[in-house]
C-alpha cells in the first residue's frame, strides 16, 4: 500500500504515477475521499462514545427524579453509537478497498508507457553467428535433456521433464546462484510453496493478475509463483533489526504459474511453463538504502549471467509493465538465437515500502521509533536460463558446450547425443 502521508501531501505525484502506468488517476481522488470519510466516521464515533461515557456517569450520580430522563438519553446514545460504529466499519471497508486499488508510486526516471517503452541501460556481449540454429527444445530432446511429450502426458500442456544432464544443468545453475548469494551475505531459505491469502495479497499478487495464481479452494491456500511471496511474509507483523544493515535472503523453491493470459504465446519448449525452479534474492532494508540495494541486486544478477557466458542486455522496465508492488524494475534479457531477440532471464524490483506496509514489517529508527521497512526482490537463477545456455552454446554438430562454471555440476564440458 502507498504511504497515506505522501498521498495527502503529493496527490499530483500519485496521479502522475497512475498515468505513467496506464492506470486510472481517478483512483487517487477516490482514495482521498475515502480517507476523509473514514477519518470523519472515526471522529463521529469517538465523539458519540465520549458523550455516552459522560451520560453514564450522570446516571450514576442522578437523583431518582432525574434518572428516567437520563436513562432514556443514554439509550438513545447507545443506539447512535451502534449506528456510528457500523458507519465507521463501512467507511473502513471502502477505504481499504480504495487503498488496495492503487499501485506503488513509480520512482522518478522510470520510463512511462507500456511493455515496449522500456529503456536499454546496457548491452553485454555480441551474439554469435550461428548458421541455421536449432531451438532449445530441438537440442534438449536430441541430447536427452528435456521431455515435453511425457510432461504433457503426465500433467498437460506447459509441463515437462528435465532428464539426465538436463536435470544436472538446472541443479548446477541453482547451486551456482546459492553459492553467489551466500558468499554475499544472503541467508539460504527453502520456504513453503503454499501460502495464506493475506500473504499473497500482501505482496500484491491478488490484484489485476490474480488469475495467474493457482488457488487450492478447499484449503484457501495459494501456490506461489516465486519465493518472493513467502519471503515477504517471513517477517510479517514483526519489528526487525536493521541496525547492522539490510537483511538478505535467498529462497530456493519450485514456482507455479497458471499463465492464464498467455494463450498462444511461447507454446513450444520451456520458456513459459506452469512449474519451474528458481532462486530468488529478497532484501529487507531501510527505505533510504533501497536504491543502493537495487543496484547491488542487479550487480549480482549480472555476475550470474557472466558465469553462463551469454549475451544479454539490461532494461529499465516501463511503468505500464511493472507489477503493482514495484516502483522500479530492471530486467536482464539474454539473446535467443532462434528468435533473434532478447528474452527475460532475470528481473529485480524495488518495492519501496509498499509490501512491508501491507504486511506490517517494521524496523526501529535511531530514535527507537518503528518505521516501515523497504523490500526488494530479484531472480538469481531459474529454469528458463536453460533456453539461453542451450541455444547460445550450440555447436555445428548438434552438441552444446557447457559453460565452464557449470562443468563441475554437469560432469562434462560438452553435451553430446
From Swiss-Prot:
| EC number from the UniProt entry | 6.1.1.11
Q: Where in the cell is it found?
A: Cytoplasm
Q: Which residues bind ATP?
A: 257-259, 273, 344-347
Q: Name one GO cellular component term.
A: cytoplasm
Q: Which PROSITE patterns match?
A: AA_TRNA_LIGASE_II (PS50862)
Q: In which pathway does it act?
A: Aminoacyl-tRNA biosynthesis; selenocysteinyl-tRNA(Sec) biosynthesis; L-seryl-tRNA(Sec) from L-serine and tRNA(Sec): step 1/1
* GO BP: selenocysteine biosynthetic process; seryl-tRNA aminoacylation
Q: Which GO terms describe its molecular function?
A: ATP binding; serine-tRNA ligase activity
Q: What does this protein do?
A: Catalyzes the attachment of serine to tRNA(Ser). Is also able to aminoacylate tRNA(Sec) with serine, to form the misacylated tRNA L-seryl-tRNA(Sec), which will be further converted into selenocysteinyl-tRNA(Sec).
Give the UniProt family note: Belongs to the class-II aminoacyl-tRNA synthetase family. Type-1 seryl-tRNA synthetase subfamily.
Q: How does it assemble?
A: Homodimer. The tRNA molecule binds across the dimer.
Q: What is this protein called?
A: Serine--tRNA ligase
Q: Which organism is it from?
A: Mycobacterium sp. (strain KMS)
Question: What does the record give as the organism's lineage?
Answer: Bacteria, Bacillati, Actinomycetota, Actinomycetes, Mycobacteriales
